[in-house]
Each structure stands twice: as structure tokens, then as C-alpha cells.
Amino acid sequence: MTLDISKYPHLALANTPDELRLLPVESLPEVCDELRTYLLNSVSQSSGHFASGLGAVELTVALHHVYNTPFDHLIWDVGHQAYPHKILTGRRDQMSTIRQKDGIHPFPWRGESEYDVLSVGHSSTSISAGLGMAIAANKEGLGRKVVSVIGDGAITAGMAFEAMNHAGDVHSDMLVILNDNEMSISENVGALNNHLARLLSGSLYTTIREGGKKVLAGAPPIKELVKRAEEHIKGMVVPGTMFEELGFNYIGPVDGHDVTELVKTLKNMRNLKGPQFLHIMTKKGKGYAPAEADPINYHAVPKFDLSQNPLPKAANAKPTFSKIFGDWLCDMAAEDEKLMAITPAMREGSGMVRFSKEYPSQYFDVAIAEQHAVTLASGMAIGGYNPIVAIYSTFLQRGYDQLIHDVAIMELPVMFAIDRGGLVGADGQTHQGAFDLSFMRCIPNIVIMAPSDENECRQMLYTGHKHQGPSAVRYPRGNGLGAEIQKEMTALEIGKGIIRRQGEKIAILNFGTMLEYALEAAEKLNATVADMRFVKPLDEELILELAANHDVLVTVEENAIAGGAGSGVIEFMMKSKCLKPVLNIGLPDRFVEQGTQQELHTALEIDAAGIEKKIRDYIA
């Protein structure tokens, strides 16, 4: 989207932070208005993360106006709110390509811009990384400043508090900004706190505060009394006592949509010593009424018409695997009052909205706390209940030790419903579910299932729920294949696959929803196709049978080849001294970039044509 100067006269003067810093503070409200309008028009035409960026416009402008980026390090947690940052850092005309194949990255990305000092995508990493950069900057001695911006959801994660606890201990110079969009600010409270922020971050207060510390250093009881008095006074008007206890100087909350006041406060705080904490209040979706009213559904959007509401929906779309899971969850809860469902802040994405409303006493959203989610399930299982952890593949990585230490070692009946297994598409490297089969397969005591369609997914969920030990059902993002759903639920025989097509010479061992591709390729090759169903335990009897009756075995999976299901097949064959050629088809040994799922399947040659080509090349 090329900038029309007549519509954006102020924004046209700020294509980079250097240009923005040349503008007078008085013009920044107009810059913000135009930036918000540009963001609205751009994302509505390209798709992408929407509501978060709209709420961070004034903060972004103020930060780049006050701080000398990229010399000063500005870190965005997760990165959903970083679209305005991308627009102001030389990528304005490329915004129409965001999240698209070969386009600009959906999150801050080091390889894309010198202004993106940390590649992100998962939450709650900004304070730890910022503290590391602050320590390095202190040793460097060049006066480099470090700012970490984190949201009210991300700051609930344990990693964020671990970082703040350490920051208070080492006392490095850094600023943490909490972008709190949980509520709107009333005019009076906003004005009062803006005034307090200027007062508490100003040089007079800071000088008195630091001078008092030195004077009272020799009288610890009095020093402690004064410290408590200061915290008490702050606590009467601002909710910052907890952050003060962690060693931060807390300022706020202030109006995050008053760019002039933000600039004043940030200028005051820029040269303060030690860890600083600025709490700002913003409105997610600011400037677009439908997004303000429904920020969850407007978190990420398809292409849409700004003049129309609600967002467009695909006509007659097949149900998603997430919906299949959500419907199964409700059906199962009707039979099992001991079923407990846990999600780490992924209610909508995991298809759990209906369940949360129909079975609220059995539903637990633990916020962004994957480690806690897994061990919470462990405790529930010990207590005699039947917990299910609904989690994205990419986020299960964050609870890996708990999966091993708190579930698998004790062989507890916890089932993991792993959504977004395989390639998720537009969110790129940080979100592809490429590794779960590999990192789970090496864990003893766990049953791992990979359904080939939505009905098999439903039956596997039932199988895992009834299994008296750890289990995982791994399914992809997006719509199902149109398979007929059997209402009746039947437990599958653990570790048994089935033949889906009988051929000769070549046997394709399929794991998961690549089955459709495998069958299409098999028609061209006259190959046998087995739906293996179980990654662990493998159907060893079926593998030996296929090896005995075919010249070549081919494994197909939407997971990293390294350590994946295909690796398991080869390991078993070597152990059994079954010396037959085996071709592994799956994801390559690299982080897979963004694009639609279909684009990536084609590019990586794991669609039907790619599978056929790889097999023909192998047997040539």
C-alpha cells in the first residue's frame, strides 16, 4: 500500500524514526491519527494482527520520538502490537505483504530490520532479553538505553516475573512498559495519574529520593521506614506496590493514548538509574469501534471491508479440527463429570468457547502459563480427575520439562489435545508446529496419536481420554477434510494402524492428515498406503509386513524429519535387522517461513505432487 501524501501529510514526514524525531511534539497527535488510519486501511486489505496495534499507536510514536532507535534498544513482547513500529521504521510501503509468503514478517524479526533487536512471536520474553541487553549496555558504557514493552496478558507468565525479580537484584538501567489494555481510563483518573507520573518521574522527586537513600544509608531502620512510607503513599493512588517490591521504581498508570503526556513522562524516565516500570492504560482496537467492542475476534483478521461488520466468514466451510475437539469435549463432559479441561489463554483458538459456557466448573483458563497448565493437570490426575490440556504445538514446547517430570515419569492419565500440529501458515517460524512428534517421541510412557481426518481425531480423543496413562492427540490448524463424523465413540486399539490402499513395490506409511496427499500420490505410483495412526507405540507388526511385501518404504508426516515418526520407523527396522530402503518425507531441518499452508506444502514438496516427485527421484 503506497502512501497517499494528501491523506497522510504528517505521516509522510516520518518514514523513519530519525525523521519522526525532527517533528515538533505538537504535531505528534496528528501523526498518531494518520498512523492509526493507515494501519486500519493497510491491515484490512492484507489481513493480520489488528486490535493490538491500534491500541499501541501513541506509545510507538512516543517511544521512537524520545529514544534514539536503533542505537537504543526497543523490544516488543510477542509482537502483535508492533505493526505501527514496522510502519515507522521504513517498512510502511511493504505492509500489504505482511504475513504473506516472501513478505515482511508478522512479528519483529532481526533479519528484517535493525530496529527489530529481538525476534519474537511467543510471549513474555521481552524483560529477560531486555535485562540481558541492559547488562551488556552497562558494560559497553556508551549510554545505550533499553526498553521492554509487555502486555497485561504476557506479564502474567512466570518468565516475566523471574526476569523482574532478577532485574531488581542486579539493578541495571532499563525501562519496562506495561501496556495494559484490560480497561478504559476515566477522564479524572487519567488526568490525576498523568500528573503523578510527571511528578514521580521528574528530576526533583528523583533527586530527593536518591539523596534520601544516601543520607539514611547509615540508619537502616529509618531507611526501611521511609521506604515503606513511600510505598504506602504510592499504593494509595497507584497499583504499583508489587513492582516496587521487585525492585522497580513504579510510575503510573497513565493514559496510553495521550501522546504528548507520554513523551513528557518518557523523557523524564529516560535517564533514571536502575530498573524503571511505566504502567500505561490503553484500549485494544482504539479508533475502530467494532474492534474496541470485540477485541478478541478482531485480534487477527482476514481481509475485510472497514465499512462492514461483523468480519466475513467462509461460506459452507468444513468444521475445523479445533471445533471437532470442542464438540467432543462437550459430548465427553456430558458423560464424565470428572473431565477437567485446561487451556493456557487459548480458549477461542482451541475451540473451547462452548465448553467454557456449558461446563464452567470443569473449565480452567490458566492464562499464559504453560508450565503451570501441565503440572496443574498432573495434580488433578493425582486427585482422581481426568484432565485434558488443550494447547498449541508451538506452546507445548514451553511446558516440556513438566510433561516429562510431572506427567510421564508418574504415568499419570493426562491427555494433551495438541492443536496447530504441523505448518500453521502465516505466523511463520515461531508458530509452526514442527517439532512436537520429535520431542514427545523420546519420552517413555506416552501414547502419541496422529489422526488422518476429523472423525479419526474424535475417536482418538476418546481413546486418549480412556487411556490410563499420558497420551497426546496431535491435529492441524484449519478445516477438516469432510469426513463423516460418527457420533458413537469407540476406543482404538493402541498401536495399530490400517491399510487404506493396496498397491505393490512401494509402501507409504502415513502419519496424520497428510493421508489425502499420500493417497493421491499412491494412485500415480500404484503404491500401498498405511494410515499408521500411532506414532508411539508404532505398529511394528504392520511395518514388518509392509517391509516384507514391498521394495521401498516411504514415511510421510508434517513434522520435522529429524527425530520424527519416520525416524522411529527406521530405528525399529534397524533394531529388527530389516534392511529395506526407507525414504522419510517431512519438514526440512530449518525453521519454516510464513505463507499459506498450501503454499508451504507445495514449496516444501510435501503435497501430493511433491510426494510423488520425491518417491520417483528416490527409486530412479
UniProtKB/Swiss-Prot annotation:
Q: In which pathway does it act?
A: Metabolic intermediate biosynthesis; 1-deoxy-D-xylulose 5-phosphate biosynthesis; 1-deoxy-D-xylulose 5-phosphate from D-glyceraldehyde 3-phosphate and pyruvate: step 1/1
Q: How is the cofactor bound?
A: Binds 1 Mg(2+) ion per subunit. Binds 1 thiamine pyrophosphate per subunit.
Q: Which UniProt keywords apply?
A: Isoprene biosynthesis, Magnesium, Metal-binding, Thiamine biosynthesis, Thiamine pyrophosphate, Transferase
Gene Ontology molecular function, alphabetical? 1-deoxy-D-xylulose-5-phosphate synthase activity; magnesium ion binding; thiamine pyrophosphate binding
Where Mg(2+) binds, per the record, is at 152, 181
Gene3D superfamilies attached to this UniProt entry? 3.40.50.920, 3.40.50.970
Q: Which cofactor does it need?
A: Mg(2+); thiamine diphosphate
Q: Which cysteines are joined by disulfide bonds?
A: none
What are the EC numbers? 2.2.1.7
Q: Residues that bind thiamine diphosphate, according to the entry?
A: 80, 121-123, 153-154, 181, 288, 370
UniProt record, GO biological process: 1-deoxy-D-xylulose 5-phosphate biosynthetic process; isopentenyl diphosphate biosynthetic process, methylerythritol 4-phosphate pathway; terpenoid biosynthetic process; thiamine biosynthetic process
Which EC main class describes this enzyme? transferase
Query: Is Metal-binding among the key words of this record?
Result: yes
- Catalytic reaction annotation: D-glyceraldehyde 3-phosphate + pyruvate + H(+) = 1-deoxy-D-xylulose 5-phosphate + CO2
Q: Which GO terms describe its cellular component?
A: cytosol
What the entry lists under PANTHER family is as follows:
1-D-DEOXYXYLULOSE 5-PHOSPHATE SYNTHASE-RELATED, 1-DEOXY-D-XYLULOSE-5-PHOSPHATE SYNTHASE, CHLOROPLASTIC
The function of this protein is:
Catalyzes the acyloin condensation reaction between C atoms 2 and 3 of pyruvate and glyceraldehyde 3-phosphate to yield 1-deoxy-D-xylulose-5-phosphate (DXP).
- NCBIfam families attached here? dxs, PRK05444.2-2
Per the similarity annotation, which family is this?
Belongs to the transketolase family. DXPS subfamily.
HAMAP family the UniProt entry points to: DXP_synth
Subunit details: Homodimer.
Please identify the protein, giving its name as recorded: 1-deoxy-D-xylulose-5-phosphate synthase
Q: What organism is this sequence from?
A: Photobacterium profundum (strain SS9)
